[in-house]
Swiss-Prot record:
Signal peptide interval: none
Ranges of compositional bias, category Basic and acidic residues: 60-80, 165-198, 223-238, 245-261, 330-339, 368-379
Subcellular location field: Nucleus
GO biological process: cellular response to interleukin-1; membrane protein ectodomain proteolysis; mRNA splicing, via spliceosome; negative regulation of mRNA splicing, via spliceosome; positive regulation of mRNA splicing, via spliceosome; positive regulation of transcription by RNA polymerase II; protein homooligomerization; regulation of alternative mRNA splicing, via spliceosome
Name under which the protein is recorded: RNA-binding motif protein, X chromosome
Originating organism: Danio rerio
Biased composition (Low complexity): 304-327
Amino acid sequence: MAEADRPGKLFIGGLNTETSEKVLEAYFSKFGRISEVLLMKDRETNKSRGFAFVTYENPGDAKDAAREMNGKPLDGKPIKVEQATKPQFETSGRRGPPPPRSRGPSRGLRGSRGGPSGMRGPPSREPFFKGMSSRGPPPMKRGPPERNGGPPPKRSAPSGPMGRPSRDRDPYGPPPRRDSLMSRRDDGPPHRDDHYGSKDSYSSRDYMSSRDSRDYGPPPRDYPYREYSGHSSSRDDYGSGSRGYSDRDGYGGGREPRGYIDRPSAGSYRDPYDGYGNSRSAPPSRGPPPSYSGSGGSSRYDDYGSSSRDGYGSRDSYPSSRSDPYSTNRGDRPGRQERGPPPLERGYPREYSSSSRGAPRGGGRGGRRPDRGMGRNRY
């Protein structure tokens, strides 16, 4: 396959590293006249690489030398003698492949070049695998995070719509309800929706005791109906107390006792509210329940609590238990007491006077309250 070099040129391989060009020339000159002897040496070390080229002037002499000297020992080593091929093919075919092979393995085996290359190879592979592993796991980590992140986003996406809406429902849902309640309470008739209004007015009374009587609507609206339960008992106390009042104060014929006794629906709650007013002011308070939410609770509380205690104290059936829930709960709730006082004079001042309560209210403090109530009702 390799193309033969010029005729008369022989390749001599397997030489001893100690063999020199002079020895080769003396050994091969007996077959003919030699034009050139070329011993291949290492460039760095200048030592023989183990092969050489001998060129005869007559190609026939080269054939004779190859035939006779091939496999014969020279300096203790058998040598190989054959027709030389062209240098490019020699480098690629014979010398070439061995050098690359020798270079490849030698470099691979050598610590200097091969080691680094080998080290570079495996380390590069290791970093590669590490990079793959690190990158891979990070992708996997990213994958899982993406999976985790992805699914959780999916989860958060559903949960976001669900959870966030739920959150939105929690913060925003009740406020709209409050707003709706506020709007309802802002409207005249919605004040009649005091199944909320009443409850909120309770909570508003608790919270509004410290506020001015002018914060009528909004304060009750600000506080949801969550604390209605605690005040429902107070309603019951009011209702029961008002029932007792209505029964004993001669309200039996009035509309309010029925409201207290029946109380089937929200309207009945309105009635108990009205009844609360009516325990003081009977039916007139029914009409404008909204005015419940606004009054100075403390002053009313003092007047009302003291008067109520004065009025109720005389009765055995109305011990401090009646007067206390009435006074304390009413004290915290500034709202309805204004309604109470104005209706007091409007509604049943005389009936009140007939009752034990009437005396202190009609005589001493009753007169002052309408003034206060009227002054504040202006707002």
